[in-house]
Amino acid sequence: MNPAAEAEFNILLATDSYKVTHYKQYPPNTSKVYSYFECREKKTENSKLRKVKYEETVFYGLQYILNKYLKGKVVTKEKIQEAKDVYKEHFQDDVFNEKGWNYILEKYDGHLPIEIKAVPEGFVIPRGNVLFTVENTDPECYWLTNWIETILVQSWYPITVATNSREQKKILAKYLLETSGNLDGLEYKLHDFGYRGVSSQETAGIGASAHLVNFKGTDTVAGLALIKKYYGTKDPVPGYSVPAAEHSTITAWGKDHEKDAFEHIVTQFSSVPVSVVSDSYDIYNACEKIWGEDLRHLIVSRSTQAPLIIRPDSGNPLDTVLKVLEILGKKFPVTENSKGYKLLPPYLRVIQGDGVDINTLQEIVEGMKQKMWSIENIAFGSGGGLLQKLTRDLLNCSFKCSYVVTNGLGINVFKDPVADPNKRSKKGRLSLHRTPAGNFVTLEEGKGDLEEYGQDLLHTVFKNGKVTKSYSFDEIRKNAQLNIELEAAHH
């Protein structure tokens, strides 16, 4: 086998081991398995445990999975043989469903006889509602629905990144509006610094793209190509960055030459924004003496379009930001905006890119507001907190079977564990609707078939190996906008 073929993705090997044995476990004469995905509501959670509630989620990332892994001819003779060999050793037994996969290869030319219906990407849906459903379209392939659970549930990651990023956008929007009276620059207030902090190149691409649903600033280049390939934008790129220093480009000049490093860098990038990490030795000395005195003449001459952005990168994030602002406020002319908050001159800004997650972000903007500093003065960079410090449990992303057909009879099925009512699952065929008041509601047990409830918001996105509906990244961004943004645009 050539190396290229060896490296090719094999859906037969992309499932949890136990699922390989499940075709032998369903009731005899099962002809349909219908399952759904949701971000479960936590009904009994002690509200004091978590500062952020995450009451709604951004649906994003299924389209990538369908296009990269599930569409087209995904079953071949070679892949069946490879899986057969692996599972014989892995289980030390011949448990693999070779016959079932050969059926898909022969009858459907290796295309998956599956239908997936999903809410439009970018939609913001309260927890506890159905987000997508999966069912087999060939009665012989009842076992296939939950075989692909494993890969489909990995959508938890882009959903969670997009949701957490949007919750941070809510915080920033609230404080920016309160301290400035407008939302100018909101989409550049949280910059993705997470490339090195994630577990893989693929994670970087997916996570960065999910953040870009809400914002436009990123240093995680991998997100750009993923969006271009799987979603598309009207603009040439969906995300932007600016020249910036790292510690090596400062410390390489030597400890006694930090001023020379700073001077060189701001001169190299005189007509665009430039971010300069300033804590290599002493952030407070850098702000007061180097920026505030020695190089002050170079800073005050910069344009509004090309500010110096000072980057602290150590210490307690809130304390450091406040002290940096205080020092800069003494060294540069501060004005008061229409809301009565202090504003640095337009050629000078701050970015805090260390220790930033949704909780510290809230603390910093609240602390700034209390000290009468406008959020206009600052932007944030977040890495691990944005792309890596998240799990499937944060939003309780879950995939469960809700309906089966056995011996020609449809049955609504569910789980309801005695020890955890939060884990109870939905019953029967599901649909998602909007009430006349505009709220989302999930109807169970096939009730959505009744016309009185209006259209189902779940649309077929995949059927029998084909992606049947796609969303552009621009549509997704529009769907995910904050209410506060829509109101501001309206005014």
UniProtKB/Swiss-Prot annotation:
Q: In which tissues is it expressed?
A: Expressed in large amounts in bone marrow, liver tissue, and muscle. Also present in heart, placenta, lung, and kidney tissues.
| Gene3D superfamilies per record | Aldolase class I (3.20.20.70)
Keyword tags: Acetylation, Biological rhythms, Cytokine, Cytoplasm, Glycosyltransferase, Nucleus, Phosphoprotein, Pyridine nucleotide biosynthesis, Secreted, Transferase
Main location class: nucleus
Give the pathway annotation. Cofactor biosynthesis; NAD(+) biosynthesis; nicotinamide D-ribonucleotide from 5-phospho-alpha-D-ribose 1-diphosphate and nicotinamide: step 1/1
Family classification = Belongs to the NAPRTase family.
**Any idea what this protein is called?**
Nicotinamide phosphoribosyltransferase
Per the UniProt record, the source organism is Homo sapiens
Q: What is the lineage of its organism?
A: Eukaryota, Metazoa, Chordata, Craniata, Vertebrata
